[in-house]
Design a protein with these regions (language model features):
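Active-site and adjacent substrate-binding regions of carbohydrate-active enzymes
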Residues: 1-211
Length: 211
């Protein structure tokens, strides 16, 4: 059976009139504790999936409460390191993970694309914008659901295409992930160097998923 249960988009679970309904406090954490009490006797590990900007420090709150956090910072940091030939921001994050004993599950590509909103507070905003422009220039797409101010949520692209469909860059990115602190996850499409499929997007239309 399952050993780890992912709680997808968990921060949106508790709802209340007049609240922002994203990570409502204390309701979100109380609900998570209730699930934990059900899961613990079964030996299940919970993995709350929460997208939030680095500057909000929600990953630290998860760590303080004894949960692992999805490392949604790593995908953008690795692209930044490879394309801009610098490792300072990536190294800063790696040091923080080690020094603060933050338990992470990391990834590069995924079915939602490449998360970039999460980098706010870790990368300068101009650099985030440049990453978006680079990935879009390589065939990535941005679905703007909430207006210009939130345009850089996730860029819909495979990781291989985001790296310019370069075998050497993809291998380097995967090596960095494997040696990064945390438990690595590999999206099945990345195993086969999957490329952006614009024809599939066209066929799916507005109601289709993003990948």
């Amino acid at each position: 059976g399952a050993a780890i249960v992912r709680l997808d988009a968990f921060a949106y679970a508790p709802k209340a009139p007049g609240k922002k309904n994203f990570l409502n406090d204390p309701e979100t954490w109380e609900f998570l504790q209730q699930i934990h009490e059900l899961a613990a006797p079964l030996g299940l590990t919970l993995l709350p999936e929460i997208h939030a900007a680095y500057e909000e420090k929600i990953y630290k709150t998860l760590a303080d409460k004894g949960y692992a956090t999805y490392d949604f910072f790593l995908p953008g940091l690795v692209i930044d390191a490879i394309e801009n030939r610098r490792a300072d921001y990536l190294a800063k994050w790696a040091r923080e993970v080690v020094d603060d004993k933050i338990s992470t599950v990391n990834m590069l590509g995924c079915h939602d694309g490449i998360p970039l909103l999460d980098l706010k507070g870790l990368l300068p905003e101009d650099d985030i914008r440049s990453l978006i422009d680079l990935i879009v220039s390589r065939g990535g797409m941005v679905k703007n659901l909430h207006g210009q101010k939130n345009i850089y949520y996730q860029v819909n692209a495979t990781y291989y295409s985001a790296l310019g469909e370069s075998d050497s860059k993809m291998l380097l990115a995967r090596a960095i992930q494997m040696f990064m602190p945390g438990k690595p996850q590999v999206w099945y499409l990345d195993l086969f160097a999957g490329k952006n499929d614009h024809e599939a997007v066209r066929r799916a239309g507005e109601s289709g998923h993003k990948e």
